[in-house]
Amino acid sequence: MTIAAENLTANHPRRKWTDYFTFCVDHKVIGIQYLVTSFLFFFIGGSFAEAMRTELATPSPDFVQPEMYNQLMTLHGTIMIFLWIVPAGAAFANYLIPLMVGTEDMAFPRLNAVAFWLTPPGGILLISSFFVGAPQAGWTSYPPLSLLSGKWGEELWILSLLLVGTSSILGAINFVTTILKMRIKDMDLHSMPLFCWAMLATSSLILLSTPVLASALILLSFDLIAGTSFFNPVGGGDPVVYQHLFWFYSHPAVYIMILPFFGVISEVIPVHARKPIFGYRAIAYSSLAISFLGLIVWAHHMFTSGTPGWLRMFFMATTMLIAVPTGIKIFSWCGTLWGGKIQLNSAMLFAFGFLSSFMIGGLTGVMVASVPFDIHVHDTYFVVGHFHYVLFGGSAFALFSGVYHWFPKMTGRMVNEPLGRLHFILTFIGMNLTFMPMHELGLMGMNRRIALYDVEFQPLNVLSTIGAYVLAASTIPFVINVFWSLFKGEKAARNPWRALTLEWQTASPPIIENFEEEPVLWCGPYDFGIDTELMDDEETVQTLIADAAGS
């Protein structure tokens, strides 16, 4: 049900389309720039995945040669992590945080623009490595393998990640400062939206872990270019040191990729279930707990790397412990759904897809956290299936949920719901068909990252490839929906979902200054069910806001 609210944008100047191609400091423009750029890289990285799955439909190299397969595999992983999911989280944070806390812009607008404009050059550098021999050592780039493949392709990979990592650090500084220092006067930490809590936890992880990755990459670059031996065993270096440095960032990176979308789900579910969030403080504090525990679990990636037994036990325990705050979130979301007036629109369908898929990824995560089990499935397709259920079934489903939820606010247009539902159905079927067989392949002993495999693995690989084609097809209704809705969609009201957070108090899309006057907290961000009949009347809502401002 929509509310016929005045579209304030009509009375104010709007951003021109050319602003989205310039060094604009408006956080909303930067948020859209991040979102569009991340999806462009999603299509590039996804096309690499389709090429890989086409090759894996047969045991022998029929479609691409093993060297090209290794390059595609390396760039696919790097793009999907560093140029799709991470920037997509930054897109929502840039667009929403100032609106949610009731301020005009980020704390450091120019720094915010610099952060974005480091990302496209990073992506261009990475893809241009094809012209000099793309890296073949995987997205982890372990030495000595990374020291033996194409030197200049590997160097471009390093420079790309340094640019994107710098972008993440600059963005995190902005997010933390804006959340802590620029909230409106009536908003304390426990009355701000849970998305802001999620970004506070994410930004803390970025600031603590990304410099460690940068140091590892710089040392690896010296080994490549200057002939040093920090990680080269031929000269007395230790490759395991690189693994520790790399995973000290790259396991927290999993939470950097999922925590923003935990925040998205915490916004979507109460709005479309018409019910207060269950356990606000539990969800908020569990984000901080995940952020802390995420820094002390990295060596579970190294159970087979000569890690001492006592250290294995420590990291197994901390890895299993991190399931506790994650489980708190799952139970809180399910508690919010229980007894709610659920609206099965596109945003909510993807939220349901997130819940079911992420729980599968979480359960398999507890399995691989166990040392005896991990030793047997390490570097097999079981691990590939696990992390794709976490990152695609988790982050990507929540990303699409957020796109459908905030599309009216960002564009001033409603999405086409039948196309959105078709997008969800194809994505859900394709995702499970692609990644579920990988668990069985891993248990059967199929190694990851290799183009050649035994013929006994072919039936499940064919099934997985069919699923990948369904996933590719699922993007068609999504793209059609976005462009059709932009130009032909029904005009959106200021608050079509009858939500309570501050971004819905301004026009759709928001005016350049965000708000005509300082917004007012007239209720909590999730006070659904309290005089809910009032929410059906926009005039009554505005009266309540005015009364709150007067008091």
Curated annotation (Swiss-Prot):
One of its GO terms (molecular function) is metal ion binding. It catalyses: 4 Fe(II)-[cytochrome c] + O2 + 8 H(+)(in) = 4 Fe(III)-[cytochrome c] + 2 H2O + 4 H(+)(out). The chain crosses the membrane at residues 29-49, 79-99, 113-133, 156-176, 205-225, 245-265, 283-303, 313-333, 348-368, 382-402, 424-444, 466-486. Keywords: Cell membrane, Copper, Electron transport, Heme, Iron, Membrane, Metal-binding, Respiratory chain, Translocase, Transmembrane, Transmembrane helix, Transport. It is found in: Cell membrane. InterPro entries: Cyt_c_oxase-like_su1_dom (IPR023616), Cyt_c_oxase-like_su1_sf (IPR036927), Cyt_C_Oxase_1 (IPR000883), Cyt_c_Oxase_su1_BS (IPR023615), Cyt_c_oxidase_su1_bac (IPR014241). Heme a3 binds at H386. It is an enzyme of class 7 (translocase). Belongs to the heme-copper respiratory oxidase family. Cytochrome c oxidase is the component of the respiratory chain that catalyzes the reduction of oxygen to water. Subunits 1-3 form the functional core of the enzyme complex. CO I is the catalytic subunit of the enzyme. Electrons originating in cytochrome c are transferred via the copper A center of subunit 2 and heme A of subunit 1 to the bimetallic center formed by heme A3 and copper B. This is Cytochrome c oxidase subunit 1.
